Amino acid sequence: APDQANKANNSGSAGVGGNILGMKGGAGMGYTVLTWTRDGVTWHRDRHTDKFFEPDPKVGAWDHAMAWVGSSVVVGDELYLYYAGYRWGHKYQHSVDRQLGLVKVKRDRFVARQAGEKAGTLTTRALTLDAQALTLNVAAMKGEVRVQATTASGEPIPGFRFEDCRPITADALAATVEWKQPLATLRGKPIRLEFSIRNARLFAFEVK
């Protein structure tokens, strides 16, 4: 998520009792939800309604009942997610029709903030940066993302306003934000970052 405070995004498994076509009631079905932490100690999990990865809805598919992501491996610009797929629920005929699956997603694209033709704005809390560059993980081929820096009280800083920012219109994992002034001039000052998103998705940002 485009929140620098989130230290990690990992997957967790969730299971609920329920009916699946061709199975007895309560056979159990499983899917994957996201968990996250801000301090590396306390973890939170999405609600059951916020599924990250679901079983194949096609009856008879090898992963129709269960799709539990276990391990992940970074391969270049992609994340390989290996998951356990069950044809039947985990309470039904154990060890029958179970296989391993692989899903490939672009790196660090678990969740996003997005907007349509009407631009939306996302504002961070106050930050004190010690950085020379800001990069965005975005999908903005049909729209654009701009960024402006404001004071902690919300006043746009000259040279770092939306109109001073070159629009990002790419599908990129690390698109560099360019203003009329270098980001290093804001070093040590409390600021907020505001993202203007139009027909685009913002997955993450990084300062370095």
Predicted segments, located by residue:
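Carbohydrate-active catalytic/glycan-binding domains of CAZyme proteins
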Residues: 1-208
